[in-house]
Every structure is written in structure tokens, then in C-alpha cells.
Amino acid sequence: MFGSIEKTPENLGLFTRCSQYMQGEGLRFILEADRRRAWQNSGTIIWQLNEPWPNASCTNLVDYYGETKTAYYQVKRAYEERHVSLDYRTLTYKRGENFCLPFLFPTAGKPFREK
């Protein structure tokens, strides 16, 4: 996705989009894991919402100019009242390998009933 880290990226826009996607995936993964641990975990707060100066680091959701980053939308989806999440422990499954992935369908404290 990112290519070699020994040289300057040839396409800075693509590099930025990929890095923002990875930031959002990390936050989404953490938030979903925390929600699956309800009520052992009381909740999660994003430490820093916005950036104090123009930069390309940190876990914030809004950039210095007030524009929402990719992570904003991934976090927003992870906090939806009805959001299915997989409990996966690795991303290195082999082609054709069988595995079981438990999932959770949290409903913001409301019981879930099949129709």
C-alpha cells in the first residue's frame, strides 16, 4: 500500500489517503473491540478531536483547517447504534484456510430480538 519507506513518496496525495485510511482502521478496530467488551469497558473517548497546527500525525479526526479526515467517518460508523463488528485476532489468514470469526451486534443497551 505505501511502498518503500527509503524514499519520498512519488504520489503524496495517495500516500496521505492511505495513511489516513490506516489511521481510521486502527481507531475503528479499537472502538469495535471496546464495544464488544461492554460492560467490562465503560467507553472510549478520542483524545484529540482536531489538530492545533497543520501536520500529518496524531489520532485526531479533524485537520487544522476544520476538514474531517477519513478516520472521522470510520469512527462515526463504529459508534452507530446498530453496528456489526467481527472479533478477528489476525489479518494473516491463508487462502483456503477455515476459521471462525465471532461477531457482535451491539444495540446501545437494547436487547436484540429476531423477527
Set out the residue ranges of the language-model regions.
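Substrate-binding clefts and catalytic carboxylate motifs of secreted carbohydrate-active enzymes
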Residues: M1-F99, L104-F112
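Terminal RNA-binding accessory module
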Residues: K115
